[in-house]
A protein has these predicted regions:
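Flexible, glycine-rich active-site loops centered on histidine and acidic residues
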Residues: 17-33, 95-162, 204
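Acidic (Asp/Glu)-rich catalytic clusters
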Residues: 48, 75-83, 110-116, 196-199, ...
Length: 361
């Protein structure tokens, strides 16, 4: 390969990966939850024209900062107002749901939007223990790992007609029949999830945007240990990254102060809508608050388009990511749209990479 400068290397690396969006439907002190959900539809329409490959919706419960609690419903709404991007869950928290119900909802989505739906599954409840109990209506909410494995295996047995003849579920069909389950992705923030995704032959998405785990370890472990399956012939690893970009570094840093304050308050058990940069500037931070913010900033890419480009490209190279999925939590919806516009322009997105390259089939 010909020698290239730092900027040229960044562009060269980027051409090897796709760029996608994870939308949490952020709630702010100026944006109530209903408006946040409508902002998601607005951003999805906008992103679909910019050339992003995927648009995923999250499942979180009882979090005042996030309106995204029902990703399957939002997927249908987003898919209906877009035409290019793959739309999926990032993810459905499987311990909260009956596997058959998850399958049927996503088969319906696949039937309505064939070839455009992704089923991302998470192992955590996406909430606190009390809310988890309210969701599941059972007393034991501590054995989530084993529960996930049981539910995931049940889902696979339904899809493959793998239940023994004498099993009561052998007579149950996930409807609509004749419609395949969308490509499965396992989400995680540690090497355990990466190893599990590799063993079952699923796609893998690593949540670096909230994990302290070095991303290179799980991302490379997944790729090295991947086993082909009926779902996927080759590994596909997505790196989830939190990024805030503006025309100038100073403006991006100002926008990021909303996330700084949210992180400082969350560490104290104080949850609320995302505050404005002005409120964040007036907050009386303690030395411990500032230490926590500094630590969190290490995994948050903030800056001008060029700076964010370099940061993302470096992570994509070190983790060998096939795709980078960006989440941007800022106070102003227009600023969030502009951030993705800047990313699309900086990375020279023209149109989404061909869906057949990423559907796992």
């Amino acid at each position: 390969m010909e020698a290239v400068g730092e900027r040229g290397l960044s562009v060269y690396l980027w051409r090897m990966v796709a760029l996608s969006i994870l939308d949490l439907s952020p709630v702010t002190t100026a944006t109530p939850p209903a408006a946040a959900l409508n902002n998601t539809l607005d951003l999805a329409r906008f992103a679909d024209r910019l050339g992003f490959t995927r648009y995923w919706l999250a499942e979180h419960h009882n979090l005042p900062t996030i309106a995204s609690s029902a990703p399957d419903i939002m997927i249908g709404q987003v898919a209906a107002v877009t035409k290019n991007m793959r739309i999926g869950s990032g993810g459905v928290m499987l311990p909260n749901h009956a596997p058959l119900m998850v399958m049927e909802r996503f088969k319906v989505l696949e039937a309505l939007f064939p070839g455009r739906i992704d089923l991302g599954l998470g192992r955590a409840p996406g909430t606190d223990q009390i809310t988890s109990l309210a969701l599941r209506r059972r007393q034991d909410t501590t054995n989530e790992q084993d529960d996930f494995l049981d539910r995931f295996q049940e889902m696979i047995l339904f899809e493959t007609n793998g239940f023994p003849h004498n099993h009561p579920f052998s007579k149950v069909a996930a409807m609509p029949t004749g419609v395949p389950l969308p490509p499965i992705w396992l989400l995680g923030s540690s090497d355990y999830s990466a190893q599990l995704a590799a063993q079952v032959g699923a796609g893998f998405s690593f949540a670096y945007h909230f994990s302290d785990f070095p991303p290179e370890i799980p991302m490379l472990a997944y790729r090295n240990q991947f086993k082909r399956s009926a779902w996927r012939q080759t590994p596909h690893a997505i790196l989830g990254v939190a990024a805030i970009v503006a025309d100038a570094e100073s403006e991006a840093d100002r926008m990021a102060t909303s996330a700084d304050l949210h992180f400082a308050r969350r560490a104290l058990g104080q949850y609320g809508p995302l505050a404005s940069p002005d409120e964040a500037a007036a907050y009386p931070y303690t030395p411990i608050d500032r230490q926590r913010i500094e630590h969190n900033r290490k995994r948050l890419i903030v800056g001008s388009p060029t700076q964010v480009h370099e940061g993302i490209a470096a992570l994509a190279e070190s983790t060998k990511a096939d795709e980078v999925m960006i989440t941007t939590m800022v106070f102003d919806h227009a600023a969030r749209k502009h951030a993705y516009e800047l990313l699309a322009r900086e990375f020279e997105l023209k149109k989404p990479l061909r869906l057949s390259e990423f559907d796992g089939r």
